Regions:
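Alpha-helical oligomerization segments
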Residues: 214-217, 221, 226, 231-294
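Surface-exposed, low-hydrophobicity interaction/linker segments
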Residues: 177-224
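Extended, low-hydrophobicity segments enriched in charged/polar residues
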Residues: 12-195
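Surface-exposed beta-strand edges and their flanking turn/coil or helix-capping segments
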Residues: 71-74, 200-203, 244-247, 255-257
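N-terminal start-of-chain detector that recognizes signal peptides
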Residues: 29-30, 158-160, 203-205, 211-217, ...
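Compositionally biased, intrinsically disordered low-complexity segments enriched
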Residues: 1-12
Length: 294
């Protein structure tokens, strides 16, 4: 079951540093706690979003996570990326700056209009990177050809709907571990009434092929508007999960969504799933999405 407090002796240095910089109200989930219990508590808190002005979010906190969140804030303020140097006020200033840049760039466009353009731009970047890799290694697969064949194929996902209530993979894994060094699961209360803003409050990404916070905001606002999809859990520094209120039900639209998710996480159809077809099967009518970056 969730624990709201622990004794000082059980507080890790990672936890102390994180909560000093990100002083969001939270509950601590005991290692081995049933995932269904944690999900039930999440659902309870989610009912309070509009009255209490916060959104729940699971974070499996590790030192790598803490460091990955310190770096973008440090870069924003042009200071050494030292968790001891930063202040909570600088973290708040970072959040405000990221949100303001997103809103300024979006201007009068709707979340869906701006998101569509941003996703197209991100997809071009990913495809260009794949094309360059193919030029360096002609024996490697041709990404542009692969994408074209997928979109023009007759493949459509199965029509069978998903009946089971969603349960986040991060919680299922945490239920099975029995070592404290696997991280500590926190159920945070992020101080916003818009879950699409979470990337600005918990900065991660901007490394390898993981988009930075500003790019993530374009995706999260677009997907929230279109599917009611919201970020729900960050498992370590490289696994992000969404819960989806209005799953995609049209098979052709599911293929298009698979391409959008590829733009967001280019490792998805090749390292998490076997191919675009398997990714499409997973997201079609699914109430949860999963992303992992190498």
């Amino acid at each position: 079951m969730p624990e709201s407090t622990k004794s000082e002796s059980t507080m890790s240095e990672t936890y102390r540093h994180f909560t000093r910089l990100f002083p969001y109200p939270h509950e601590r989930i005991a290692v081995g706690a049933p995932a269904t219990d944690a999900m039930a508590r999440y659902d309870e808190l989610a009912q309070l979003v509009h009255t209490e002005r916060f959104v729940p979010f699971f974070l499996n906190l590790t030192d790598t996570v803490r460091e990955s969140m310190v770096i973008p804030v440090s870069l924003e303020h042009d200071i050494i990326d030292d968790g001891e140097t930063l202040t909570p006020e600088q973290v708040s200033a970072y959040t405000r700056a990221i949100l303001q840049r997103y809103r300024t760039a979006r201007d009068a466009a709707s979340a869906e209009e701006y998101g569509s353009a941003a996703i197209a731009q991100q997809l071009r970047r990913v495809m260009d990177d794949g094309e360059e890799a193919n030029e360096d290694d002609p024996d490697d697969f041709n990404l542009n050809k692969l994408m074209g064949e997928f979109m023009s194929s007759d493949f459509l996902p199965d029509e069978e709907p998903e009946d089971d209530a969603p349960c986040l993979c991060a919680l299922l894994r945490y239920e099975l571990v029995d070592e404290e060094d696997k991280g500590e699961m926190l159920l945070l209360q992020i101080p916003t009434d818009d879950p699409a803003d979470i990337p600005a409050y918990l900065p991660f990404g901007g490394w390898n092929d993981c988009p930075d916070a500003e790019t993530q905001l374009a995706f999260t606002h677009y997907w929230r508007e279109k599917y009611g999809a919201i970020p729900a859990a960050l498992d370590g520094a490289d696994c992000l999960e969404f819960l989806v209120e209005r799953p995609v039900t049209d098979p052709v639209e599911a293929k298009n969504l698979a391409v959008e998710q590829f733009a967001f996480c280019s490792d998805l159809p090749f390292q998490v799933f076997e191919d675009f077809e398997q990714l499409t099967e997973f997201i079609h009518q699914s109430r949860q999405w999963y992303f992992w970056w190498d």
